[in-house]
Amino acid sequence: MSKLNMTPREIVTYLDEYIIEQKEAKKFIAIALRNRYRRLQLEKSLQEEITPKNILMIGSTGVGKTEIARRMAKIMKLPFVKVEASKYTEVGFVGRDVESMVRDLVNNSVLLVENEHKEKLKDKIEEAVVEKIAKKLLPPLPSGVSEEKKQEYANSLLRMQQRIVQGELDSREIEIEVRKKSIEIDSNVPPEILRVQENLIKVFHKEQDKVKKTLSVKEAKEALKAEISDTLLDSEAIKMEGLKRAESSGVIFIDEIDKIAISPKEGGRQDPSKEGVQRDLLPIVEGSVVNTKYGSIKTEHILFIAAGAFHLSKPSDLIPELQGRFPLRVELENLTEEIMYMILTQTKTSIIKQYQALLKVEGVEVAFEDDAIKELAKLSYNANQKSEDIGARRLHTTIEKVLEDISFEAEDYSGQKVTITKELVQSKLGDLVADENLVKYIL
């Protein structure tokens, strides 16, 4: 089944492999994404009338808010960008304006489409690269030679190509012509400045300018791959498709939305620009036209997912108009000791599996006893209770501390099996978790 055509149940089943619990949040995301697919199956006139129901996710850091949205965008190949609301300033102040999040989305969308096109042409690109390098390594065939010599040259070229593909000649150096690196355009500036940037680049930088470079065959493969890709790809078609996809199926995840809420608890320490950022954000979420370097994009069919911990403020502290643009709200549960244990043992790419794979590169086999995993979950949970609650992110810190010496002295353990026991976990973490000051500064 096409990933774009996943049913809500299939979406939740997929998310269950990577994220423990948070059933309600998974359900909301699954329905919202399925509705994108449903809308695209309707006739054009009705499509325009149906706008996405934006979601507000409420929960502490590290409980899975970002991961749920990111995983879904990845599996369904949707244009996705994650931004932090606290990084923006209202128009007229120094800093990033909120429209830049839409430009970032379009950039990601175009890159996504470009990579898909490159994947389709992968074999053709690699063949062209190998042929070009082979011709550089072989002396050119003189004109007017016999058919027999031409056949010999063709056979030599074929053998040379096979050796290049197999990596036998990766260290050999060759001189090739490569196009000058194009100048990057800052897409976060206002449209007027963006156009000035593009015009200046056209004047001072010619795309066709090339320079000679001496590279290894391995480096030449990558340099030529990028160049040949550009000649084979239809850049205009990619830009148009990227714009269209961002417009119809893009997802913008706005984290830390609570940081721009105006809380009565803050009293006189209120930042006057917070409401300004909310008001600047409002037309984008409601639906407006944003200019990007690839063209204009309408934002009314982009799905916005906002998230925040709301420890110092409440969702009702956002301006009413913005609250109304996030009609679906879901609260994510805090992580218990049991959930911590499940995260370590039941997720498809758990932190434990990641560390085991990393150390296996050094020839070290790491095994965790079940009691050790339970102790890790318990101590991580306790550390969250005594210090700032950072959710599942605490597990990275505690496991890193337990495996610190083994990771550093990995070559001494090469070819051995190392078992992580409950006693080892306690010896590494017990005193740290017991001391509240040490928890704050070390864990």
From Swiss-Prot:
Matching InterPro entries: AAA+_ATPase, ATP-dep_Clp_protease_ClpX, ATPase_AAA_core, Clp_ATPase_C, HslU, P-loop_NTPase
Keyword Chaperone: yes
One of the Pfam families matching this protein, by short name: AAA_2
SUPFAM superfamilies: P-loop containing nucleoside triphosphate hydrolases
Cell location: Cytoplasm
Main location: cytoplasm
Domain of life from the UniProt record: Bacteria
GO CC list: HslUV protease complex
Signal peptide stretch: none
Binding site for ATP: I20, G62, V63, G64, K65, T66, E67, D255, E321, R393
UniProt KW keywords: ATP-binding, Chaperone, Cytoplasm, Nucleotide-binding, Stress response
Self-association and partners: A double ring-shaped homohexamer of HslV is capped on each side by a ring-shaped HslU homohexamer. The assembly of the HslU/HslV complex is dependent on binding of ATP.
Family designation: Belongs to the ClpX chaperone family. HslU subfamily.
Protein name: ATP-dependent protease ATPase subunit HslU
